[in-house]
Amino acid sequence: MASDAPEVKAPKAKTQKKPKTAPTHPPYIQMVTDAILSLKERDGSSLPALKKFIEAKYGKDIHDKKFPKTLSLALKTFVKNGKLVKVKNSYKLSDAQKSKAKAAAKPKAAPKKAAAPKKAAAPKKAKAPKKEGEKKAVKPKSEKKAAKPKTEKKPKAAKKPKAAKKPAAKKPAAKKPAAKKATPKKAAAPKKAAAPKKAKAATPKKAKAATPKKAKAAAKPKAAAKPKAAAKPKAKAAKKA
């Protein structure tokens, strides 16, 4: 009878599930809106285009092996919630989602502008008194420089104008051009006196040349005496006899 009793199975120990690690990437709606606004396609962005953009920008933070399936499921839920609008095989942002995205982008730029005036804080004014202290330390140096002109014997330099009397040496320079003008005049005078000397030398030469011509004229009568011409008629007379 005891064998017919059903055996009671011992309950299995429940295995503790590993705690899910919080994702380091932003939520899917934020990644999808960023992808659609960055791609700027008129007819909307397709699933492959959105997947490529998200993997390129947030791939390091996504550790889901089934990321393509989870992305497609997320897009379908966003269309049902009215956050996205599906046009054929592409997805666009709804008007409500566009306004949210623009409103989220404006406050990010505003704190940066507010941080700029904070940098221009009063510490720069604290540096100003330090510069004043440095200027005070420099002032005694300038006073010492003001005392130096008393000891400097610069008035002696005023005696140097004695050397300025050297311009009187210009007088010998003026004598030199005067001497140059006198020398050419003296050289021109002897040249004119040399001309009559040449005329005196020409007169004796003409007298000497005239005397030999007269001697030649006296010799000519000696050649004129030819008595031999008279003897020829005697020979002719002998032939006649």
Swiss-Prot record:
UniProt keyword list: Chromosome, DNA-binding, Nucleus, Repeat
Region (Disordered) location: 1-27, 89-241
Basic residues: bias regions: 11-20, 99-111, 156-184, 194-241
Sequence repeat residues: 111-116, 117-122, 123-128, 184-189, 190-195, 196-201, 204-209, 212-217
One Pfam family of this chain: Linker_histone
Family: Belongs to the histone H1/H5 family.
Annotated protein name in UniProt: Histone H1-II
Species per Swiss-Prot/TrEMBL record: Volvox carteri (Green alga)
Primary gene name: H1-II
